[in-house]
Amino acid sequence: MYLEKNIHVMDSFEFEYGRVLENVEVEYRVFGTPKYDEDGFLTNAVLFFSTFNGIYSFLRESHKYIMSHGNFTDEFYFIVISPLGTPGSCSPSSTGLNYEFPRYTYADGINFIKQFLVEKFKIRKILGLVGEGIGGYIVLSWACEFPDEMEFIFIVNSAAKVSGYRFIISKVLELIMDSTEDYYTDGYSISKTKNMIAVNALLFAHSSSKKIFNNLNNDEITAIFEDFNDECIFSDIYDFKFRNECSMEYDVVDKLGNIKAKSLFVGTNDNYFNFELDMLPFKELVPNSIVIKQEDTKENYYFEEKDYAPVGKDVIAFLEQFKK
């Protein structure tokens, strides 16, 4: 489903440490049916935050099944926002600041979105937050710090902190980007492009089920890798580096008990996020939460729509209770 891109320009935005940028752009898309209370406030806003471009996305692949069987476009008003630091919205590449862009945190990212919502939409309370992968970091940070601001959260393939093997991956990504010879020069360069290809290759290695990769021959893996690299070839080194630095500081484990929203967590293949290590602990750490798994029974790289039926039914049942 193609969604028309919209741009809202905020007069200014102040980062936590005090730096202010002016004429700050926010890229967003909307779909669904808005509903309002008697005072004109939007009551059914559901915000969505995606994972890395190019890697396997449960929500992208299961979207057709969930939407066609749940009729949510008539009940929810979805707002898909490009967060702070990502191209389209205010980011190192889109502002032209590149390596001089302000260093930001997830607290900055939440303040960025909240300011946008105040300026663009009339909302007292968000109905729900949906996040996948690193998009889940935003949702969990928000639900921990401002637990009264949403009714539900829905998280797919994410984690409560960047640590262990995932921190090692982030450090390797940092080393690759720091080795760029002309990092502190503006414009295109071969070294920047080569290093981003290396970054994408590392992400690819951790983006899907090891079981599935072991059942593919090298030609099939090469074809999948080329598709992945085509999607990521225009990734900007500055956007990625600042986002990577932000993610390495992410840790909300000790705050998960603050969450008041009804919560659904879905884990899928053993990829960048591990179900047992990353997703299952939410069952004990987050009050009033449900944790389910999309079982990896496939021998092929791609799932078909019917493969999402078991988990899709649980997702639909969870979301049904929030229809206004």
Where are these regions (language model features)?
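Catalytic-loop region of hydrolases
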Residues: M1-L47
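Conserved acidic catalytic loop of the alpha/beta-hydrolase fold
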Residues: A107-G128
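Conserved hydrolase catalytic core segment
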Residues: I126-G164
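Alpha/beta-hydrolase
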Residues: E174-A261, F273
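Conserved alpha/beta-hydrolase "acid-adjacent" motif
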Residues: Y272-D278
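Catalytic active-site module of serine/aspartate enzymes centered on a nucleophile-bearing elbow/loop
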Residues: N288-K324
